[in-house]
């Protein structure tokens, strides 16, 4: 058992990206923040499933080529091997929770030839 305040951790890119509160041994738990117009590389996981819960703001999450606009209070579950791309097309930062399980040290497969420009506004 442990208790942690999110302020004890830092976002990967200063004011954005994931902030992992827990990495393993069975799951990853992160608070994720994207600034306006910021995105994250299209990718998939071979083993892990990923879940996002939107804490504040609005974000577009593209799963297997279908764009889903999510807002505060929305939840999305992404299965292994589903290519997903996250982009904040809006004027306010987005803050969400990300949970990945089962924990894998390396399970992110970036999709290099993905046409992400079609999903940017």
Q: What do these predicted ranges mean?
A:
Residues 1-28, 108-121:
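A short, N-terminal "cap"/entry segment at the start of jelly-roll beta-barrel domains
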Residues 25-27, 47, 91-92:
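Short strand-connecting beta-turns/loops that link adjacent beta-strands
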Residues 25-27, 58, 66:
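Well-ordered beta-strand scaffold positions
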Residues 30-45:
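Conserved short histidine dyad/triad with adjacent acidic residue
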Residues 39-41, 60, 76, 80-86:
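Histidine-centered metal-chelating micro-motifs
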Residues 47-49, 54-59:
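Glycine- and acidic-residue-biased ligand/ion/polar-headgroup-sensing regions
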Residues 65-80:
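Short acidic-glycine-tyrosine-enriched beta hairpin
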Residues 80-106:
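Ligand-binding loop in jelly-roll beta-barrel domains
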């Amino acid at each position: 058992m442990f208790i942690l305040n999110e302020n004890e951790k830092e976002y990967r890119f200063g004011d954005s990206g994931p902030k992992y509160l827990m990495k393993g041994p069975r799951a990853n738990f992160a608070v994720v923040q994207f600034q306006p117009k910021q995105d994250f590389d299209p990718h998939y996981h071979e083993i892990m499933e990923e879940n996002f819960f939107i804490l504040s703001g609005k974000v577009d999450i593209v799963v297997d080529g279908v764009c889903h606009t999510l807002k505060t209070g929305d939840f999305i579950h992404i299965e292994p091997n589903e290519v997903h791309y996250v982009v904040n097309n809006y004027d306010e930062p987005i803050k969400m929770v990300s949970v990945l399980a089962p924990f894998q040290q390396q399970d992110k497969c970036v999709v290099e030839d993905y046409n992400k420009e079609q999903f940017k506004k």
